[in-house]
C-alpha cells in the first residue's frame, strides 16, 4: 500500500479514523473528542494520494464509529446532568409552610462564646527556675581527684619495674644506686612512721610486710615525680644501720601522720550548695538576637521602552549645545559686534566693512536668497505678481525714452513685493529686446498688459473677501484660484484679438516664465479648449501649440 503513510501516521487526519475502523478497542475518549469529523470527511473526499474504493469504505466505517461514540458520550453527559438537576431541584421537598420561609435568628447566627485559650499563666512562670534548669551541679561537671595506690605505683611503668622490684630487694641488689637525685639520711623512727602510708593498699600481692621493697619503689625517679604531684611535703630516707643505706631528712620539723583508713587527697563535697561553686544565671540581654533578613523586593521599572515622542524630543533638544549669551556691560563696540554678528546681517551684507555705502547697496540688490519658504497660497500669488510685474516692466521700458536702463535700475514694485528673481528677469528681458521682431511683439503686447493689470487688480479685490471667508475649505480655494487664472488668460487673449491677432502662440506666451508658470498657462489652454473658447492645433509632436478663437470665445 503506497498510501500507508497517509493513513497510519500518528499526526495525520485519517489516523484516528483508520484506528476506529480496524481496532476500536484502542480508541480512547480523548481520541474521539479530538477528532474533527468535518475536516476528516473533506480529507477523505479530496485526499492527497488516490485511495482505493475499499479503503475509503473502511474510512467511512471509522467515521460512523467515531460519530456513534460521540453520540453515546453526549447522551451519557446529558443523562448525568439531568439526574443531577433532578436531584438538586426536587419539587416535592422544597415546599415549606409560610411560617418557615424565613429562618430564625439563632439558626443563622453564630453564638459569641469566647473560650479560654490553652496558654500558660504568665504569673505562674518561675523565672529563676527557668534560667537555672540548664545549669548543672558541681559534682556532675567536676572530675574526682581520688587516686588509688595502683595508680601511684603503676603509672608510666607498664608493670615492668614493679615486677623487678618485687623480686629484688634494695638491700640485696644494688639496682638503683646510679639513679639521679640526692639521697639524704633519715632516722629509723621516721622510716617506721612513713611505712603505714604506703602499705594500706592491700592489693593481695603479698608485699604488705616487705618494707625494703616498698622503700625501693619510692626511691625511683618516676615514683618521686608522682609523689610530688600528690603534694607530699616530706622526703623518705633509708635507715642508717646498713653500710650502704641512705637517709632523707625532712624539711619541716613537724610530721604529719595520715591515718591508714583515709585516702589521700580525696575531694570533700560540701553539704550545702551555697558554700560550693555555683554558676550565675545567664543574662538573656547579653545574647544578641539573630537578625531577621528582610525579604528583598523586586523592583521593576514602570517604563520599559522609550516612546517615539521621547526619542524625537531628545534628538531635537539643543539645551546642551546652546547657552544664553552673557555680555559684559554694554559698550559701543559690543553693541556693534552684537548687531553685525547675527545670521541675517552676515548673510545679507559683504564680509568687509571698508566698502562704500553705494557699493553696499548694490551688493544688497544683487544678493539672491534661496530656500525662503512660503505657504502654498502665497507662492502662487507671488508667481502671478512676478509675471504681471515683468510684463509691466517691459511695457514701461518700451514706451518711455531711451533712458529706460536707468529706470530698470530701480525695482518696479506691485503692492510692495520685491523678489530677487524679478531683478534677474529684468536683465533677461533687456537682453531679449535686441531683435526688431521681438520689439514689435513686445509693443503689441504692451496694450494687452495694461488692461490685464487693471483686470487683475479688480479680480483680486473681488476674490480677496471670498478667499478670506473660505480659508477653511481648501478645495474651494483651489478651484477659485484656477478660475481666476483661466479668466485672466482668456481676457489676455481677448485683448490680443481686439488688437488684430487671430492666432496665439503658447511658446510666446510662456517666454521668460518658469516651469510652474508655463504649466499653469498650458493647463489654462486645455480648460479653455474644453469650454470651446479656443481651438488648439499643433503641426508636429513637441511643436508649438497655436490657439485660435472658438465659438464660445466671447460668450463665457
Swiss-Prot record:
Signal peptide: none annotated. Keywords: Chromosome, Chromosome partition, Meiosis, Nucleus. The keyword NAD does not apply. Pfam families: Rad21_Rec8, Rad21_Rec8_N. CDD domains: Rad21_Rec8_M_NXP1-like (cd21792). GO terms for biological process: chromosome segregation; meiotic cell cycle; replication-born double-strand break repair via sister chromatid exchange; sister chromatid cohesion. It is found in: Nucleus; Chromosome. It comes from the Eukaryota. GO terms for cellular component: chromosome; meiotic cohesin complex; nucleus. Gene3D superfamilies: Structural maintenance of chromosome 1. Chain E (1.10.10.580). One of its GO terms (molecular function) is chromatin binding. InterPro entries: NXP1_M-like, Rad21/Rec8-like, Rad21/Rec8_C_eu, Rad21_Rec8_N, ScpA-like_C, WH_DNA-bd_sf. SUPFAM superfamilies: Winged helix' DNA-binding domain. Its main location: nucleus. Component of some meiotic cohesin complex composed of the SMC1 (SMC1A or SMC1B) and SMC3 heterodimer attached via their hinge domain, RAD21L which link them, and STAG3. PANTHER family: DOUBLE-STRAND-BREAK REPAIR PROTEIN RAD21-LIKE PROTEIN 1, SCC1 / RAD21 FAMILY MEMBER. Meiosis-specific component of some cohesin complex required during the initial steps of prophase I in male meiosis. Probably required during early meiosis in males for separation of sister chromatids and homologous chromosomes. Replaces RAD21 in premeiotic S phase (during early stages of prophase I), while RAD21 reappears in later stages of prophase I. Involved in synaptonemal complex assembly, synapsis initiation and crossover recombination between homologous chromosomes during prophase I. This is Double-strand-break repair protein rad21-like protein 1. The gene is RAD21L1.
Amino acid at each position: 500500500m503506497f498510501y500507508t503513510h497517509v493513513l497510519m501516521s500518528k499526526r495525520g487526519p485519517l489516523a484516528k479514523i483508520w484506528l476506529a475502523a480496524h481496532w476500536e478497542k484502542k480508541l480512547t475518549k480523548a481520541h474521539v473528542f479530538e477528532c474533527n469529523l468535518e475536516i476528516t470527511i473533506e480529507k477523505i473526499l479530496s485526499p492527497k494520494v488516490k485511495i482505493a474504493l475499499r479503503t475509503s469504505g473502511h474510512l467511512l466505517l471509522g467515521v460512523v464509529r467515531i460519530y456513534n461514540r460521540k453520540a453515546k458520550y453526549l447522551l451519557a453527559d446529558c443523562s448525568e446532568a439531568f439526574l443531577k438537576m433532578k436531584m438538586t431541584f426536587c419539587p416535592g421537598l422544597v415546599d415549606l409552610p409560610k411560617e418557615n420561609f424565613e429562618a430564625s435568628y439563632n439558626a443563622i447566627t453564630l453564638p459569641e462564646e469566647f473560650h479560654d485559650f490553652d496558654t500558660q499563666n504568665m504569673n505562674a512562670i518561675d523565672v529563676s527556675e527557668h534560667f537555672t534548669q540548664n545549669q548543672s551541679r558541681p559534682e556532675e561537671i567536676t572530675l574526682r581527684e581520688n587516686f588509688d595506690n595502683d595508680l601511684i605505683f603503676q603509672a608510666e611503668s607498664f608493670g615492668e619495674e614493679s615486677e623487678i622490684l618485687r623480686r629484688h630487694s634494695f638491700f640485696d641488689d644494688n639496682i638503683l644506686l646510679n639513679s639521679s637525685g640526692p639521697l639524704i639520711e633519715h632516722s629509723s623512727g621516721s622510716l617506721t612512721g612513713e611505712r603505714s602510708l604506703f602499705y594500706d593498699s592491700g592489693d593481695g600481692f603479698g608485699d604488705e610486710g616487705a618494707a625494703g621493697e616498698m622503700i625501693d619503689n619510692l626511691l625511683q625517679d618516676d615514683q618521686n615525680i608522682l609523689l610530688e604531684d600528690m603534694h607530699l611535703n616530706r622526703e623518705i630516707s633509708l635507715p642508717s644501720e646498713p653500710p650502704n643505706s641512705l637517709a632523707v631528712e625532712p624539711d619541716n620539723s613537724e610530721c604529719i601522720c595520715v591515718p591508714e583508713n583515709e585516702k589521700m587527697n580525696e575531694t570533700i563535697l560540701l553539704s550545702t550548695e551555697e558554700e560550693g561553686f555555683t554558676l550565675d544565671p545567664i543574662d538573656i540581654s547579653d545574647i544578641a538576637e539573630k537578625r531577621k533578613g528582610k525579604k528583598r523586593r523586586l523592583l521593576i521599572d514602570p517604563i520599559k521602552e522609550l516612546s517615539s515622542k521621547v526619542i524625537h524630543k531628545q534628538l531635537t533638544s539643543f539645551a546642551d549645545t546652546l547657552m544664553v549669551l552673557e555680555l559684559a556691560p554694554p559698550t559701543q563696540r559690543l553693541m556693534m559686534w552684537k548687531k553685525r554678528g547675527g545670521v541675517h546681517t552676515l548673510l545679507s551684507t559683504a564680509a568687509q566693512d571698508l566698502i562704500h555705502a553705494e557699493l553696499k547697496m548694490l551688493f544688497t540688490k544683487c544678493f539672491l536668497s534661496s530656500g525662503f519658504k512660503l505657504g502654498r497660497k502665497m507662492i502662487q500669488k507671488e508667481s502671478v505678481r512676478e509675471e504681471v510685474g515683468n510684463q509691466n516692466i517691459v511695457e514701461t521700458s518700451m514706451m518711455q525714452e531711451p533712458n529706460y536702463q536707468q529706470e530698470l535700475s530701480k525695482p518696479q514694485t506691485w503692492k510692495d513685493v520685491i523678489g530677487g528673481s524679478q531683478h534677474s528677469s529684468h536683465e533677461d528681458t533687456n537682453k531679449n529686446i535686441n531683435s526688431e521682431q521681438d520689439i514689435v511683439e513686445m509693443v503689441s503686447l504692451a496694450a494687452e498688459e495694461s488692461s490685464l493689470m487693471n483686470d487683475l487688480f479688480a479680480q483680486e479685490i473681488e476674490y480677496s473677501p471670498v478667499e478670506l471667508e473660505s480659508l477653511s475649505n481648501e478645495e474651494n480655494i483651489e478651484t477659485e484660484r484656477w478660475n481666476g487664472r483661466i479668466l485672466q488668460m482668456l481676457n489676455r487673449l481677448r485683448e490680443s484679438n481686439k488688437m488684430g491677432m487671430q492666432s496665439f502662440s503658447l511658446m510666446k506666451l510662456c517666454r521668460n516664465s518658469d516651469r510652474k508658470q508655463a504649466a499653469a498657462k498650458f493647463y489654462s489652454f486645455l480648460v479653455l479648449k474644453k469650454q470651446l473658447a479656443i481651438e488648439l492645433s499643433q503641426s508636429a509632436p513637441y511643436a508649438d501649440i497655436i490657439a485660435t478663437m472658438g465659438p464660445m470665445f466671447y460668450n463665457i
